[in-house]
Amino acid sequence: MFFSKDLPSPTSVFTAYASMAGYMMMIRSMAHELIPAPLQDFIYRTLRSLFFRSSSSTLTLTIDDDNMGMNNEIYRAAQTYLSTKISPDAVRLRISKGHKDKHVNLYLSDGEIVNDVYEDVQLVWRFVTDGGDKKGGGGGVGGRGGGGGRRGGMDDDGKSEYFELSFDKKHKDLILNSYVPYIESKAKEIRDERRILMLHSLNSLRWESVILEHPSTFETMAMEDDLKRDVIEDLDRFIRRKEFYKRVGKAWKRGYLLYGPPGTGKSSLVAAMANYLKFDVYDLQLASVMRDSDLRRLLLATRNRSILVIEDIDCAVDLPNRIEQPVEGKNRGESQGPLTLSGLLNFIDGLWSSCGDERIIIFTTNHKDRLDPALLRPGRMDMHIYMGHCSFQGFKTLASNYLGLSDAAMPHRLFPEIERLIDGEVMTPAQVAEELMKSEDADVALEGLVNVLEKMRLKSKESNPVMMKQKESRLEMEEMRLKSDTEGSPRKNSKRFKKLVLFWT
């Protein structure tokens, strides 16, 4: 039994607490001044492992971004995957939004835990920040580190950030051989969905990029349905045949040659392909490249899952013949010669073509007949796509895009007339689109298109070689008649000459 006289007084308790707090503050200050920071971290981790040792049946994997000086792909995959697993009950999160991002990104802050289940196995993810005063974060969807600003396992403040994955030891093989590949696969799908397409162009032999926001899609392309379907099926087949290309010993790439008159949608088709596949686009201007070595360096700097476009390949640059004379004063092993056709072809289907996966190479030209035969060799450009004048099917697509018209229920009264007039090589899709944009009223826009089509067809007939020959023959006959009619009055000859001029014009 205790008596009140045995208890210390409140004053003595407060005095003892104040003395102890003072000693603790003094010891802490001395420790910070005398013990180096790395040793402090070591002592902290040791005490933490002693007092907070996990169960002997639990295995914890540490996933750091630093992989022997290189980025750890598993860390990046976990970062992306966990961004979709954040619990609504989370109490500490961080957000970010880069200038290229379309949405706000959520990611974990220091100490936050995410629970996951894989094949009935319970897993616990935890993001940890060691050292430094600034809190880190993880689970972001970008390619940056957990805190949003570092690239390695430790940031500029000496702060180490990593993920901890804890689970029962007996499931180690399942986690390493099945769960980790599953995370990498899911992260790739998430990045593809959220990927911001970029358009890269040359500036002083360096790639500069801007966000690609071209609205063209296969749904809005003024193409024949059969051709559109063939292109989509070819792209799908290319994407899913990675193992096939490896088995047959070919580089995982695809080449397309787009040819046809100007204004037929070649550039729009490139943008539609990029939007469909979620591929970046590299616009290569060969006139800016002086040597084969520069071309090789530029092409090696392109990313996988990208489209390389060389527009107007027939007139972009005059490429020398593939058999080049060695440059005087240069060693044979140096690649300092001028840009050659062989250098370009070597990257298309030569030894350098194997550098990179999921690459699409597109050449465009207005004049296929002017191309070097080496570019048209079978197997070099896998698919030749003719982008011709606007057909009635293409017109209906444009009418739906620009005027909201559809022939599914009740076609417009002018559709039959337009179908008759647009048949043949009369107008390009760009010309048709220009006419449809002149008015928001469908009747006015289509009537204007009919008038233009009639004029274009008349002009086409007049420029027909057969008709031109007939006109020239009649002109010669009229001239001979004027010369031979010397007895005719000047007024009569003048009238005949006026008729001749009117006929010719």
From Swiss-Prot:
Q: Give the domain of life.
A: Eukaryota
Write down the top EC class of this protein: hydrolase
Any one Gene Ontology BP term: response to stress
- Say which species the protein is native to: Arabidopsis thaliana (Mouse-ear cress)
Q: Which InterPro entries match?
A: AAA+_ATPase, AAA_N_dom, ATPase_AAA_core, ATPase_AAA_CS, Mitochondrial_chaperone_BCS1, P-loop_NTPase
GO MF: ATP binding; ATP hydrolysis activity
Give the Gly residues compositional bias ranges: 137-151
Q: What is this protein called?
A: AAA-ATPase At5g17760
Entry-linked SUPFAM superfamilies:
P-loop containing nucleoside triphosphate hydrolases
Q: Which Pfam families match?
A: AAA, AAA_assoc
Which membrane topology describes this protein? Single-pass membrane protein
Which PANTHER family does the entry mention?
A: BCS1 AAA-TYPE ATPASE (PTHR23070)
Chain sites annotated for binding ATP: G260, P261, P262, G263, T264, G265, K266, S267
Which cofactor does the UniProt annotation name? Mg(2+)
Quote the subcellular location field of this record: Membrane
- The reaction(s) this protein catalyses: ATP + H2O = ADP + phosphate + H(+)
